[in-house]
């Protein structure tokens, strides 16, 4: 078959050259490959250590999203790894929470130290007990949410919030 007969334009992408991206802080428009994150953090004086990792809420919180994160958690647990930072997972619905519990994903996430929260806006809109930093203290967090504006996630304008996929968030939580 000849794609040119059916499409105005054919775009070929070499999937071997793609890598996960992370955006932020303070805007979803500031994107970079994960491999550039440390360099950008140093160049911009971002805190290098992640203080919290957050998955779910209304975005990236489906059964499939959490399942992919749970798979990484399961493999990490087999190697004795744990999250180095507080890791919170918010399923997108009560049905999703019940299904991840039924299928063992909840157990996989908890095995690396994750806390699975009730379905709610929660940390995405700053509804969590954030007592690991002082008000006004500069820190970096990573989430799979779709909002990362200043003070959005914890009321602290000095929190630098980065956004990645659930898999990227799990990886960064394991690395700290």
Where are these regions (language model features)?
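Fe-S-dependent hydro-lyases/dehydratases of central metabolism
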Residues: 1-176
């Amino acid at each position: 078959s000849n794609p040119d007969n059916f499409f105005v334009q054919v775009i070929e992408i070499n999937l071997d050259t793609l890598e996960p991206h992370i955006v932020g802080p303070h805007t979803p428009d500031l994107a970079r490959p994960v491999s550039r994150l440390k360099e950008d953090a140093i160049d911009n004086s971002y805190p290098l250590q992640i203080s919290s990792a957050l998955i779910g809420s209304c975005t990236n919180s489906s059964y499939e999203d959490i399942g992919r994160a749970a798979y990484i958690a399961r493999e990490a647990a087999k190697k004795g790894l744990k999250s180095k930072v507080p890791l919170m997972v918010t399923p997108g619905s009560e049905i999703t929470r019940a299904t991840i519990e039924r299928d063992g994903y909840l157990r996989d996430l908890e095995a690396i130290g994750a806390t699975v929260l009730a379905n709610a806006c929660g940390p995405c809109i700053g509804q969590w007990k954030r007592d690991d930093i002082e008000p006004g203290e500069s820190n970096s967090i990573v989430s799979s949410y779709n909002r990362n504006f200043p003070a959005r996630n914890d009321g602290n304008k000095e929190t630098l919030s980065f956004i990645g996929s659930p898999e990227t968030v799990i990886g960064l939580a394991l690395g700290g």
